[in-house]
């Protein structure tokens, strides 16, 4: 029965949904709930074509970065190859068999001059006082040569990163010092009232001078890096008091180490601490640590723990920033500023803190003579120095020249300034 709505209009009763579906015309089925939900999902999903385009756009930056990386690696490889080829070319030109003729008269004068230096009266504290007079407050009179204790965080040792300081490495320094039973200069050398010292460089100028006998007579003989004694003692002597080096520079041959040597280590980077710890403990350095060195390093150092020392990094800082007045280190994406002194110049400054009288032998950077032998023991030419990017050898030569001319040190081989 039909009911009338307000206003007199008829109101038909609602049919159930199933009936409505049945009343739909044939061939035109009403969408079900499942179909409507599927349709809604399909409408909200991006088309496959749009998705592919978006994915391709995301890939483009990645491909660009990969191309840039490939080009960078290629350029770096070409640079390394060029450096190696150039270095090998220089090596071939400076075979020791082609050494320039050594004037016998000059050899005799050099030997006589060395004997004269040794025979002169030793003047206590002369090197220190002369350096202080020459450089004023830029040279410290009371700077300890070796690390003897873990410095306080506020001390100068922690102002810079290695090699100028030990910032962020206090734990590693403490570990190393606990392994070393002795930290100072040996007692028998400290007890000597006045010491004559000689720093023997690696310069080719030593070859043929036959100064070995004279060099052996100095109280303290400081040798650098892997400069050999075996096979060259006639020219460079065979006495060694200090072997001063860094991991990559340490001699690989056991024959270059003597039971009385002090092995003074210069620490440049984090893995250098690991290497020194392994050497002191007579352990094998892990392979993954070796990957961080730029050349092969010694696997063992045949010395006792009491013979190892750590160079005070403030001596390097004093040499670089105060005396040579290099700029302080700046963070760079690649390479270094030329603000790291050579081991040789650092050793000269160290000698003024250790010794009363200081002499040099085997120092010479004749950059205007590119075919002059660089070392007394290998085939490298002086031209090889033009490819290194860490040291300013011109500034260092001027510094050594100043020391020799002012009488602070004496040049026994005449490579910096000849006085014979």
Curated annotation (Swiss-Prot):
Keywords: Disulfide bond, Glycoprotein, Glycosyltransferase, Golgi apparatus, Lipid metabolism, Membrane, Signal-anchor, Transferase, Transmembrane, Transmembrane helix. GO terms for cellular component: Golgi membrane. Coiled coil: none annotated. Its EC number is 2.4.3.9. Glycans are attached at residue 238. Residues 1-67 are cytoplasmic. Residues 9-18 have a biased composition (Basic and acidic residues). Residues 20-29 have a biased composition (Low complexity). Residues 89-420 are lumenal. Its main location: Golgi. The keyword Lyase does not apply. InterPro entries: Glyco_trans_29, Glycosyltransferase_29, GT29-like_sf, Sialyl_trans. GO terms for biological process: lipid metabolic process; protein glycosylation. It catalyses: a beta-D-Gal-(1->4)-beta-D-Glc-(1<->1)-Cer(d18:1(4E)) + CMP-N-acetyl-beta-neuraminate = a ganglioside GM3 (d18:1(4E)) + CMP + H(+); ganglioside GA2 (d18:1(4E)/18:0) + CMP-N-acetyl-beta-neuraminate = ganglioside GM2 (d18:1(4E)/18:0) + CMP + H(+); a beta-D-Gal-(1<->1')-ceramide + CMP-N-acetyl-beta-neuraminate = N-acetyl-alpha-neuraminosyl-(2->3)-beta-D-galactosyl-(1<->1')-ceramide + CMP + H(+); ganglioside GA1 (d18:1(4E)/18:0) + CMP-N-acetyl-beta-neuraminate = ganglioside GM1 (d18:1(4E)/18:0) + CMP + H(+). CDD domains: GT29_ST3GAL5. Pfam families: Glyco_transf_29. Gene3D superfamilies: Glycosyl transferase family 29. Residues 1-39 are annotated as: Disordered. It is a single-pass type II membrane protein. GO terms for molecular function: lactosylceramide alpha-2,3-sialyltransferase activity. Belongs to the glycosyltransferase 29 family. Transfers the sialyl group (N-acetyl-alpha-neuraminyl or NeuAc) from CMP-NeuAc to the non-reducing terminal galactose (Gal) of glycosphingolipids forming gangliosides (important molecules involved in the regulation of multiple cellular processes, including cell proliferation and differentiation, apoptosis, embryogenesis, development, and oncogenesis). This is Lactosylceramide alpha-2,3-sialyltransferase. It comes from Bos taurus (Bovine). The gene is ST3GAL5.
């Amino acid at each position: 029965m039909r009911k009338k709505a307000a206003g007199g209009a008829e109101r038909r009763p609602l049919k159930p949904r199933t009936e409505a579906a049945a009343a739909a015309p044939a061939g035109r089925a009403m969408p079900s709930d499942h179909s409507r939900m599927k349709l809604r999902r399909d409408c909200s999903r991006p088309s496959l074509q749009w998705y592919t385009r978006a994915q391709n756009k995301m890939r483009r930056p990645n491909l660009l970065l990969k191309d840039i990386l490939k080009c960078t690696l290629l350029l770096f490889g070409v640079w390394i190859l060029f450096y190696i080829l150039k270095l090998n070319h220089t090596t071939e030109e400076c075979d020791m068999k082609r050494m320039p003729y050594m004037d016998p008269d000059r050899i005799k004068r050099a030997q006589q001059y060395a004997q004269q230096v040794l025979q002169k009266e030793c003047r206590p504290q002369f090197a220190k006082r002369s350096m202080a007079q020459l450089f004023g407050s830029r040279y410290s009179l009371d700077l300890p040569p070796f690390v003897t204790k873990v410095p306080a965080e506020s001390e100068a040792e922690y102002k810079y990163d290695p090699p100028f300081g030990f910032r962020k490495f206090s734990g590693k320094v403490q570990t190393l010092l606990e392994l070393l039973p002795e930290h100072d200069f040996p007692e028998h050398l400290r007890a000597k009232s006045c010491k004559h010292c000689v720093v023997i460089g690696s310069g080719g100028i030593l070859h043929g001078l036959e100064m070995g006998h004279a060099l052996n007579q100095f109280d303290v003989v400081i040798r650098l890096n892997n400069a050999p004694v075996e096979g060259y003692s006639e020219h460079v002597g065979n006495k060694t008091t200090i072997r001063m080096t860094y991991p990559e520079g340490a001699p690989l041959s056991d024959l270059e180490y003597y039971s009385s040597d002090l092995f003074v280590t210069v620490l440049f980077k984090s893995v250098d601490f690991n290497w020194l710890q392994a050497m002191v403990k007579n352990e094998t350095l892990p392979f993954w640590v070796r990957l961080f060195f730029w050349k092969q390093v010694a696997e063992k150092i045949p010395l006792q723990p009491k013979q190892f020392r750590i160079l005070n990094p403030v001596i390097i800082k004093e040499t670089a920033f105060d005396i040579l007045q290099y700029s302080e280190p700046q963070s760079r994406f690649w390479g270094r500023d030329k603000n790291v002194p050579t081991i040789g110049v650092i050793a000269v400054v160290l000698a003024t803190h250790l010794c009363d009288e200081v002499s040099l032998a085997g120092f010479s950077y004749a950059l205007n003579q590119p075919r002059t032998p660089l070392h007394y023991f290998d085939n490298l030419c002086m031209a090889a120095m033009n490819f290194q990017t860490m040291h300013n050898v011109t500034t260092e030569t001027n510094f050594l020249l100043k020391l020799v001319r002012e009488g602070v040190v004496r040049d026994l081989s005449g490579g910096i300034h000849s006085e014979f």
